[in-house]
From Swiss-Prot:
Subcellular location as annotated: Cellular thylakoid membrane
Natural source organism: Prochlorococcus marinus (strain MIT 9303)
UniProt protein name: Photosystem II reaction center protein L
Ranges that cross the membrane: 18-38
Assembly information from the UniProt record: PSII is composed of 1 copy each of membrane proteins PsbA, PsbB, PsbC, PsbD, PsbE, PsbF, PsbH, PsbI, PsbJ, PsbK, PsbL, PsbM, PsbT, PsbX, PsbY, Psb30/Ycf12, peripheral proteins PsbO, CyanoQ (PsbQ), PsbU, PsbV and a large number of cofactors. It forms dimeric complexes.
Keyword Thylakoid listed: yes
Disulfide bond sites: none
HAMAP family: PSII_PsbL (MF_01317)
Free-text function comment from the UniProt entry: One of the components of the core complex of photosystem II (PSII). PSII is a light-driven water:plastoquinone oxidoreductase that uses light energy to abstract electrons from H(2)O, generating O(2) and a proton gradient subsequently used for ATP formation. It consists of a core antenna complex that captures photons, and an electron transfer chain that converts photonic excitation into a charge separation. This subunit is found at the monomer-monomer interface and is required for correct PSII assembly and/or dimerization.
Family from the record: Belongs to the PsbL family.
Membrane association type: Single-pass membrane protein
GO biological process: photosynthesis
């Protein structure tokens, strides 16, 4: 992960990271729910 000396880009990177984590959380939850539902 490259360091960016511009502090103005930090919130955008954190927002993008939280967005990816949110999508990953939804994906894992849906997989667990479907595997539990069809089991």
């Amino acid at each position: 992960m490259e360091q960016n000396p511009n502090p103005n880009n930090l919130p955008a990177e954190l927002n993008r990271t939280s967005l990816y984590l949110g999508l990953l959380l939804v994906f894992v939850t849906s997989v667990l729910f479907t595997s539990y539902f069809f089991n």
